[in-house]
From Swiss-Prot:
Any GO BP annotation: lipid A biosynthetic process
Entries under NCBIfam families matching the protein: fabZ (TIGR01750), PRK00006.1 (NF000582)
Name of this protein: 3-hydroxyacyl-[acyl-carrier-protein] dehydratase FabZ
Function comment: Involved in unsaturated fatty acids biosynthesis. Catalyzes the dehydration of short chain beta-hydroxyacyl-ACPs and long chain saturated and unsaturated beta-hydroxyacyl-ACPs.
Subcellular localization, as worded in the UniProt entry: Cytoplasm
PANTHER family: 3-HYDROXYACYL-[ACYL-CARRIER-PROTEIN] DEHYDRATASE
Biological source species: Campylobacter hominis (strain ATCC BAA-381 / DSM 21671 / CCUG 45161 / LMG 19568 / NCTC 13146 / CH001A)
InterPro entries with a match to the protein in the record: FabA_FabZ (IPR013114), FabZ (IPR010084), HotDog_dom_sf (IPR029069)
Domain of life assignment: Bacteria
Main localization (coarse): cytoplasm
Substrates-to-products reaction catalysed: a (3R)-hydroxyacyl-[ACP] = a (2E)-enoyl-[ACP] + H2O
Amino acid sequence: MIDINEILEILPHRFPFLLIDRVIDLQPGISIKAYKNVTFNEQIFQGHFPGHPIYPGVMIIEGMAQAGGVLAFKSTTDEDLSNKVVYFMTIDKAKFRQPIRPGDRLEYRLNVLKHRGRIWVLKGEALVDDKVAAEAELQAMIMDK
């Protein structure tokens, strides 16, 4: 398990754009499970949408990418990562299946499809109550800062 303090050591993101709260399972080079507790107090709900708050799809995909970044970092053991960052490269096959609302616990599950050098190809799902809310394939690359 990886708590928020360790996530902050890995990812450069900070409030209001840090979109994972905890990693609950990590199999380096294989998969990750992480979650975000979606609360009504998030700034995004002031405008998306007043009276009918829905967590934006782009934020779901970004949270998925952040979980993938943690997976890539924790899977890379053969080099010093202190001056490295993971950049999100592509989104493919993104689908949104159900809305995410305040009070939902959004769980990210990502599996490595391919890894070559510094490039990672991942298949991700975002779930609420074990039901798929969104899915996508992502590519990321570990780069120098």
